[in-house]
Amino acid sequence: MILSLLIVALALLGIALANVLGWPAVRQATTGRPGSVSVLIPARNEERHLPACLDAVLRQGESVREILVYDDHSSDGTGAVVEFYRQRDPRIRLVPARPLEPGWTGKNFACAQLAAAAQSEYFLFIDADARLRDRAVDSLVEEMRCRNLQFLSCWPGLEMVTFWEQALMPMLNFVVFSIFPGPMSLYMSHPSLALAHGACLMTDGRSYREIGGHSVVRAEIFEDTRLAQLWRARGRRGLCLDGQRVIRVRMYSSFDEIWRGFQKNFFPAFKSEISFWAFMFFHALVFLAPFLWLGVTNDWRLWICAGAILSTRLLLAARFHHPLWAVLLHPLSQSILLALGISSWWRCKRGHGVAWKGREYHKKAAAPQRD
């Protein structure tokens, strides 16, 4: 058993090393050839985040033809923020909100309304808490053209301020890039190798309309990677690249926000309950058990296994600019991750669904319910 764990831990270290060395980042724009881009921002109670987001978009230059914001029935001052910025720049438009239709999640419905109103060659969907770097839009357009893509997602840099952000948020990249073979996705088009981050999705408008876009994944809570899989399944070329140079995001700002945010996505991310429990068992056995067993045995293979896991964390921390001290908290972070998964599963199994921004969703969304 211990030897098997050691082999698996070393193999996963190899995958992480391949990602660090072979997974490409979005390149800075060099041609100066502008595109025609609609920046599409779904916003629900984003009064706090939206000003910085819009400021960053307005610095992008002439490639941005229009900036559309969908105020999804916010109860704060989101609409007033959009109106203030609209008076500064006529490219900004507020897309009128419609009642959420049965069978849709709120974000998917908002994105579909934004896409229906967009008029540019390219659609760039970004979250309201995302911050585009200078010339980010030009860089994305250039990647779309140079790589002949119809779908591009950027994995953003993570802004982390509080203790719990720095301790827990790096687990997102650890979970993904310790098992996802990023370099393989460049050369193989199978949908299983699709990956996306919902904070930054770019597609050309033509393929979006032909495929159906968010309407095809209307009930999905984990819609970003589902969209990436859909594009590949329909014969389009899509990639996810390291986007730290072009976009950053502060996803959550407290332990409570982290818990509720990942509780929303955790169990729904899996196609079946079997795959969910396989993931949970794998993470408990490979990434947590070696540290627990070291408390009762001094087997040298366990020390190497634990060292391989921490080395994986260190590699990814260096690539994604995470605080190195958080690596030492790996057993705690891994335990919280597993508790999050069980919590997400339990809510869905008991029919409570997952609450997010005043709505409650079930694994396959029906009509949302107000909290």
Language model: regions and residue ranges:
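Catalytic donor/gating beta->alpha subdomain of glycosyltransferases that bind UDP-sugars
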Residues: 144, 151-176, 206-209, 214-276, ...
